[in-house]
Amino acid sequence: RSYKRNNHKMDADGTEHQKSEGYTTLKEAEKRKKEIEYKQSLGTFVVPKCTKVKELIKEYVRIYGHNEWGVATYDGNIGLINNYIIPTIGEVQLSEINNHFMEKYYSDLLKMPAVKSSRNPDADKLITAATVHQIHKVLRSCFRQAVKWDMMDRNPATDATLPKYKAEEREIWTAEMLMQAIDACENKWLKVAFHLAFAATVRIGELLGLTWDCVDISEEAISENRAYVFINKQVERVSKEAVEELDSKEVILIFPSQRKNNKTVRVLKTPKTDTSERKVYIPGFVAQCLIDIKKEQDEVKEALGSEYTDYNLIMATTFGMPINGSYIRDQMQKVINKEGLPDVVFHSLRHTSVTYKLKLSGGDI
């Protein structure tokens, strides 16, 4: 059995508003009645402007998301909202949502098919516990804002029990495996990517965003063992919608699309946090790899003239555009298949790097 209470409030113009709230027990309904009566006696009770989840989500994105999210976070959260939140609970009244509702919702999600994507091309997989945790993170933040805006009295996601999940442990290469891959590598871009991932512990987006003004590979620097790369930006593919909606300060430039109908663009952007900016010293042989790249690039620029679009990128195509991360990953997969190495992702090379440095330093890095 459920219990309902109708709340009445007069606007400044004399218009009366009625809002219905549902409760699972009479005790909850009576408690809420006392809270409302107390707030009304103080003149602080305000009928929320948003009554449904979809209305709240819209306000949340417009006010909070546009101010707090970067373009990549916007893409991820909007995907969760459009795929899993609005279609399932968008029409639900805010007054009906409590801890019990949230726990049942999370449980029900695990029985629903996941939306078709690059990771689920055949749309034959169910929503995972990991995705439910991501959805919970968005809703918890959304409901926190609703409480702050006096649209809800409490956050129903705060104490909700989530489905258990264990993060998948991915295999990583040993330093010896990475050296084997480098020795077998015939692609110059993959080779320099391997070297920088290991020596400078860079992510693939940071690698693609490296520019010549952020390295010191001079003869003097190399001879004194102080050649370095300074990591302060990255290349990332994001939706055009995110760029247009956010007008984000983190975006330094937008690379031109090679296809007119693309829904995504590549951008050069600042890192996620200030702590991601770092100066990393590199060995002389890695500096020499960059010198060779620079020499070849300068020759291409001279030959092409105005046809070369100079973004000052280290990892640049023949015409100056940033190299695609997918190209690096494809080349890496060829080496993996050829050498029979464990099937790892490029990001795992950072863990290989950190593990090796910890071993060398005895845990002091």
Where are the regions a protein language model picked out?
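Conserved tyrosine-mediated DNA breakage-rejoining catalytic core shared by Y-recombinases
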Residues: M177, L210-E299
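C-terminal catalytic core of tyrosine-transesterase DNA break-rejoin enzymes
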Residues: A130, K148, H195, A199, ...
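N-terminal DNA-binding module of tyrosine recombinases/phage integrases
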Residues: S2, M10-K104, I293-D310, M321
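Short, solvent-exposed loop/turn segments that connect beta-strands within catalytic domains
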Residues: R1, M10-E16, S118-L126, S218-R226, ...
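Basic, Lys/Arg- and aromatic-enriched nucleic-acid-binding interface segment
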Residues: V115-R119, A123-A129, H133-I135, K148, ...
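Conserved hydrophobic/aromatic pocket- or pore-lining residues that grip, position, or stack substrates
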Residues: I85, M102, L139-C142, D150, ...
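N-terminal core-binding DNA-recognition domain of tyrosine site-specific recombinases/integrases
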Residues: E21, T25, V61-W149, A167, ...
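Short, contiguous acidic/charged loop-to-helix segments that flank catalytic cores in large enzymes
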Residues: E169, A184, L268-E277, A316-N324, ...
